[in-house]
UniProtKB/Swiss-Prot annotation:
It comes from Heliothis peltigera. Disulfide bonds: none annotated. Belongs to the pyrokinin family. Residues 51-94, 172-194 form a propeptide. GO terms for molecular function: neuropeptide hormone activity. The modification Leucine amide is found at residues 47, 103, 123, 159, 169. Keywords: Amidation, Cleavage on pair of basic residues, Hormone, Neuropeptide, Secreted, Signal. This is PBAN-type neuropeptides. A hormone that controls sex pheromone production in females and pheromone responsiveness in male. GO terms for biological process: neuropeptide signaling pathway; pheromone biosynthetic process.
Amino acid sequence: MYVQRKCLFLLAVFTISSVSGNNNDVKDGADRGAHSDRGGLWFGPRLGKRSLRIATEDNRQAFFKLLEAADALKYYYDQLPYEMQADEPETRVTKKVIFTPKLGRSIAYEDKSFENVEFTPRLGRRLADDMPATPADQEIYRQDPEQIDSRTKYFSPRLGRTMNFSPRLGRELSYDMLPNKIRVARSTNKTRST
């Protein structure tokens, strides 16, 4: 037991002397990595990893120098005369453009009214009410009032169709026969329909 205490004491003295023999007064700017003077006694987070240093006096001085340089640059920029700065050139019309009408048209073309021309409509199309047509065309292409359906304004028929067009099957029913109140059935899973 005495021998073990003596060996342990010698080991502790050797460890303390080796640690104190190395320079432990490490400054903030000194290298704290794996390649420092302390060698194998450095217990860092990971070998070779460099830690991010918080802004020290050196970083603060560099930051203040950058601020001074930016302030000086702004001062000298404000001293420049405004005439030397690049402005957009003034846009002036130097050439007068003469517009020529297309061939076959004249300036008074818009004033001319439509003349009576023989007009043949496309198959299945009806003439619009505000479209000018000759009296002969109106008599030839006017349909019977029974064939004209109010839905033709919303649904344009296919070519050549003059019959009544129903968009869905079963829509020919008269809704006068249906009851005014509609019975609402409740579902078995207690949901309500509105």
